[in-house]
Every structure is written in structure tokens, then in C-alpha cells.
């Protein structure tokens, strides 16, 4: 993780002066940006160690490569919630043994694959079925609050 972030910072500094970047450099910059987003936590809301392990694993093994940088934090929060609700045994295994074993890795890979289907809306349980949402209503003039600012000289 530390090496990935160091490479990202170096590439980011180089990219400021370069106009054309090859695909590998762009991919490295995107991965670094995802890692930076992944490491952000709300103040006074630390994650348990097992959740930190899962988050770092997901970021460093390319599990987040298909997630847009601006969606990484939401993906992380939702994925950890999904693990707590439906795959609690994976988190418990890390917490109780203090190890990240092959069985845990394979279970997490399957969980990420399943969760991505739900997250990106391509299967799994959806909150609202496609095509059943109500059409949005137009706002009346009375529903819109406007304030006029007048500059006096």
C-alpha cells in the first residue's frame, strides 16, 4: 500500500507537466486516486481492524478498478455494510484468527463479485425494479423559493 501510494504521488507530480500519458500511467493514476479515497475516514468514526483489512485488500488487489473514483467511498461503505449483514463470517474469521487466509480471500472475491452486481444495478436485489419508478412531477412556481440580491452603490 505504501509503495502504491508513493508511486501514485510520483506519477501524479509527473503528470502535472506531461500532456500525453500512456494507458499504464493513466491506470496507475486512477488506482492511486482510488486508494487515496479508500483511506479517507470520517473523523471520530474509525473502522474495526477486520474492516480496514478488507478495505485495503480490495484497493490493493484491483477489486475497485471498475469503480469510479468519485464512487469509491460509497462503494466501500456499502460493501462493508453488505459484509456485516450477509457475510459476517468473513469478517469474524479475520477478527478471531488475526489472519487473512486463502479461504477468506476466496470468500471475499466471491462477495465482491456479488456486491458489484448489486452496486452497479446488474442483477441481485434491487431496491426499485427498473421501469417501476414514478415519473417526477414538475415544480409549480409556488414551490420554488427565489431570493433577489440587489447590489447598492
Predicted regions mapped to residue ranges:
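Conserved catalytic/coupling modules of large nucleotide/cofactor-utilizing molecular machines
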Residues: 1-153
Amino acid at each position: 500500500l505504501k509503495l502504491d501510494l508513493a508511486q501514485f504521488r510520483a506519477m501524479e507530480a509527473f503528470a502535472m507537466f506531461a500532456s500525453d500519458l500512456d494507458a499504464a500511467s493513466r491506470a496507475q493514476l486512477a488506482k492511486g486516486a482510488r486508494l487515496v479515497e479508500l483511506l479517507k475516514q470520517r473523523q471520530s468514526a474509525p473502522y474495526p481492524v477486520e474492516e480496514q483489512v478488507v478495505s485495503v485488500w480490495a484497493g490493493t488487489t484491483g477489486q475497485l478498478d471498475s469503480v469510479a473514483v468519485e464512487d469509491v467511498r460509497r462503494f466501500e461503505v456499502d460493501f462493508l455494510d453488505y459484509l456485516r449483514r450477509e457475510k459476517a463470517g468473513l469478517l469474524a474469521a479475520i477478527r478471531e484468527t488475526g489472519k487473512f487466509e486463502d479461504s477468506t480471500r476466496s470468500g471475499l472475491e466471491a462477495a465482491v463479485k456479488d456486491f458489484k452486481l448489486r452496486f452497479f444495478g446488474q442483477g441481485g436485489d434491487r431496491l426499485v425494479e427498473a421501469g417501476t419508478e414514478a415519473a417526477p412531477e414538475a415544480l409549480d412556481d409556488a414551490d420554488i423559493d427565489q431570493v433577489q440580491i440587489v447590489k447598492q452603490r
